């Protein structure tokens, strides 16, 4: 196997494998917390949903891409391509939407209650989570409904113009107008959510700066400490998303200017567009004491059960 192909395959394999494992661990840890405490905090519920969406994204894009790089062909038929591409498009859209939702939610949470309106919104935030999740799923399922109509299994021969060659599937837009309109629509949606995300994150950053200046004059409570820690986690997630979003869109804008996209360019975009989904769970785990405590607890429990099993076997 060619060295470049090997490096590319190993990169995709590590990205998909570690990302899937980390997102699954986050989901399992939050499931354990939900069973133990009977409820999740609003920020935890959003992070749990983000891990679910990122897991779907890696399963529908990272895994097929890795298998294709290692030479596996004819993975999916037309129906399989339609299902996988549609699910991927929804997961990708939800990833930016939920990250934006997390940033806006945290901005409202840390904002000082300046009046009855904001106080009322703050009080209702936990009740608004479920309807917001449902609305985001419904809207993105409707917006991405055109994706299956352009998705087909790869055909023998050359790739037609205005076609995104994903390796395991082709997304054939047939003409330049459909190709450009799709690209512009996706970019406008993403930039709108990223703009809201950056605006709310800037507001959080301003509040944290003010808090740091006033911290010697104001007694710090446990609640404010937890809010500050959560706000910093949100800021790090937004920065992480913005970096890879920028790289992704630079490549995407280039792809819109050419009728035939070189495979190496398409592979680069796939890799960078999946980096957030694979790295964000590590950031969530490293900055969330509750998650780390649950994982340590689960590991200790497994070790204790294994030790008890060995002792029982020795007695027998």
UniProtKB/Swiss-Prot annotation:
GO terms for molecular function: L-tyrosine binding; monocarboxylic acid binding; pheromone binding; pheromone receptor activity. It is found in: Cell membrane. Disulfide bonds join 81-169. Glycans are attached at residues 156, 176. Residues 30-39, 119-132, 209-233, 286-316 are cytoplasmic. Gene3D superfamilies: Rhodopsin 7-helix transmembrane proteins. Highly expressed in the olfactory rosette where it localizes to a subset of olfactory sensory neurons, mainly in the apical region of the neuroepithelium. Not detected in other tissues tested. GO terms for cellular component: plasma membrane. Residues 1-8, 61-97, 154-187, 255-264 are extracellular. The keyword Ribonucleoprotein does not apply. Keywords: Cell membrane, Disulfide bond, G-protein coupled receptor, Glycoprotein, Membrane, Olfaction, Pheromone response, Pheromone-binding, Receptor, Sensory transduction, Transducer, Transmembrane, Transmembrane helix. One of its GO terms (biological process) is sensory perception of smell. It is a multi-pass membrane protein. The chain crosses the membrane at residues 9-29, 40-60, 98-118, 133-153, 188-208, 234-254, 265-285. It holds the Pfam family V1R. Probable pheromone receptor. Shows high specificity for 4-hydroxyphenylacetic acid. Activation of the receptor stimulates intracellular calcium release. Belongs to the G-protein coupled receptor 1 family. This is Olfactory receptor class A-like protein 1.
């Amino acid at each position: 196997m060619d060295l470049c192909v090997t490096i590319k395959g190993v990169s995709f394999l590590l990205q998909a494998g570690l990302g899937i494992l980390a997102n699954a661990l986050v989901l399992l840890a939050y499931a354990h917390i939900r069973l133990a405490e009977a409820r999740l905090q609003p920020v935890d519920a959003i992070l749990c949903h983000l891990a679910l969406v990122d897991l779907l994204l890696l399963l529908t894009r990272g895994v097929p891409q890795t298998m294709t790089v290692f030479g596996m062909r004819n993975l999916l038929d037309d129906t399989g391509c339609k299902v996988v591409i549609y699910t991927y498009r929804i997961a990708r859209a939800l990833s930016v939407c939920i990250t934006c939702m997390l940033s806006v939610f945290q901005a409202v949470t840390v904002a000082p209650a300046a009046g009855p309106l904001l106080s009322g919104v703050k009080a209702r935030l936990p009740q608004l989570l479920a309807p917001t999740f449902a609305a985001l799923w419904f809207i993105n399922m409707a917006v991405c409904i055109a994706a299956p109509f352009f998705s087909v299994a790869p055909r023998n021969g050359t790739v037609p113009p205005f076609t995104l060659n994903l390796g395991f599937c082709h997304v054939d837009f047939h003409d330049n107008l459909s190709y450009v309109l799709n690209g512009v629509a996706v970019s406008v949606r993403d930039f709108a959510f990223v703009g809201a995300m950056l605006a709310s994150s800037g507001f959080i950053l301003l509040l944290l700066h003010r808090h740091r200046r006033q911290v010697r004059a104001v007694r710090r409570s446990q609640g404010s400490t937890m809010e500050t820690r959560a706000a910093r986690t949100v800021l790090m997630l937004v920065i992480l998303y913005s970096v890879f979003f920028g790289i992704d869109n630079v490549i995407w804008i280039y792809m819109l200017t050419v009728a035939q996209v070189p495979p190496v360019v398409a592979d680069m975009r796939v890799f960078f567009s999946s980096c957030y989904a694979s790295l964000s769970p590590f950031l969530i785990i490293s900055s969330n004491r509750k998650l780390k405590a649950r994982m340590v607890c689960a590991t200790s429990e497994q070790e204790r059960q294994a030790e008890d099993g060995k002792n029982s076997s020795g007695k027998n």
